[in-house]
């Protein structure tokens, strides 16, 4: 069965690259969600005034990977302890957020956060928001599959390989060939 979750963990190029490499993930789409502006575009998102976050919509096969596993990968490959920032990317559009379609998804997300918070995985408290998904807007085409199309873009070269290394180190059985 297919399920979908929307995740924001900084620049969507980075989060997208991680989940494109995960076994059981069927589709990853970059987009915008969580704000009030209708039909936002990249320029408006970058202003930080729309309320939207850069997010990815992850569609996955629940027979191959669970939502808990998706979320464990998400938390391991970005910093969920710093509000509105991932590395040099600063602003509410880069906040850590899990946008859910159901109460069950929210419960699972809160359970994963509680477990990670209690087991010492992070030195600081997790500040990731867990919210209902309202409006989601697909990002412009040039943002889709960005790293694979632009592997030598300097931002990507600097930011994405460390996240992929964490994926391979901590979740070797979940990395697609």
From Swiss-Prot:
It is an enzyme of class 1 (oxidoreductase). One of its GO terms (biological process) is protein modification process. One of its GO terms (molecular function) is peptide-methionine (S)-S-oxide reductase activity. Keywords: Oxidoreductase. The active site is at residue 11. Disulfide bonds: none annotated. It catalyses: L-methionyl-[protein] + [thioredoxin]-disulfide + H2O = L-methionyl-(S)-S-oxide-[protein] + [thioredoxin]-dithiol; [thioredoxin]-disulfide + L-methionine + H2O = L-methionine (S)-S-oxide + [thioredoxin]-dithiol. InterPro entries: Met_Sox_Rdtase_MsrA_dom, Met_Sox_Rdtase_MsrA_sf. Its EC number is 1.8.4.11. It comes from the Bacteria. Pfam families: PMSR (PF01625). The keyword Cytoplasm does not apply. Gene3D superfamilies: Peptide methionine sulphoxide reductase MsrA. Has an important function as a repair enzyme for proteins that have been inactivated by oxidation. Catalyzes the reversible oxidation-reduction of methionine sulfoxide in proteins to methionine. NCBIfam families: msrA (TIGR00401). Belongs to the MsrA Met sulfoxide reductase family. This is Peptide methionine sulfoxide reductase MsrA.
């Amino acid at each position: 069965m297919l399920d979908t979750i929307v995740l924001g963990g900084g620049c969507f190029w980075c989060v997208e690259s991680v989940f494109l490499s995960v076994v059981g993930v069927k589709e990853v789409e970059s987009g915008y969600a969580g704000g009030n502006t209708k039909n936002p575009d990249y320029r408006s998102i970058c202003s930080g005034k729309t309320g939207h976050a850069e997010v990815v919509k992850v569609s996955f096969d629940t027979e191959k990977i669970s939502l808990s596993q998706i979320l464990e990968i998400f938390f391991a490959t970005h910093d969920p302890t710093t509000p509105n920032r991932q590395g040099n990317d600063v602003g509410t559009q880069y906040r850590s957020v899990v946008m859910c379609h159901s109460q069950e998804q929210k419960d699972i997300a809160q359970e994963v956060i509680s477990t990670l918070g209690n087991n010492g995985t992070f030195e600081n408290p997790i500040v990731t928001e867990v919210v209902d998904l309202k409006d989601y807007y697909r990002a412009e085409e040039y943002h889709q599959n960005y790293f694979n199309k632009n592997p030598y873009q300097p931002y990507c070269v600097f930011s994405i390989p460390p996240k992929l290394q964490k994926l391979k180190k901590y979740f070797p059985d979940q990395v697609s060939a």
